Amino acid sequence: MAVVEIEEIPALLQSGQTIAGLDLGTKTIGLAVSDLGLSFAHPRPVIKRVKFSIDAQVLLKALDADKVGVIVIGLPMNMDGTSGPRVQATRAFVRTMQPLTDLPFVFWDERLSTVAAERALIGMDVSRGKRADRIDSAAASFILQGALDRLHSIRRSASDDYDAG
């Protein structure tokens, strides 16, 4: 399926489906999955990158196991809002994944998600070695939680509009 806007997610999700968050690294893919209520992001084990065909197969299997209906993927914009090589790599990953799945993708600005994830892991007194193993999934959780919070805000706004009308 295509890349969609976050506002389109409620119409695309079927009952019992979750939303996945991805943080693409050069060596790993961080993965997080929402609960069925679409309120909380839960980190999953990172996927160690080998080559695209293997990475895609492992990722799609994990997404299927969690009944994912939409993928939110972090878009690593520069702090000034411009696109750099990592944005291009993320867009290329999505373009290459699209023929392999019917799942829609949503790009989500991930600026500072890795920094926030690392601070959270440090705050939990996770050792440097374990932080390296968990950082991408923790960042995926921050990306997904941001998207879930936005969805909640959209639903609340729609409910307020309905109540007012």
Swiss-Prot record:
One of its GO terms (molecular function) is nuclease activity. It comes from the Bacteria. GO terms for cellular component: cytosol. Transmembrane segments: none annotated. Its EC number is 3.1.-.-. It is an enzyme of class 3 (hydrolase). SUPFAM superfamilies: Ribonuclease H-like. It is found in: Cytoplasm. The keyword Hydrolase applies. Keywords: Cytoplasm, Hydrolase, Nuclease, Ribosome biogenesis. One of its GO terms (biological process) is rRNA 5'-end processing. Its main location: cytoplasm. Could be a nuclease involved in processing of the 5'-end of pre-16S rRNA. Belongs to the YqgF nuclease family. This is Putative pre-16S rRNA nuclease.
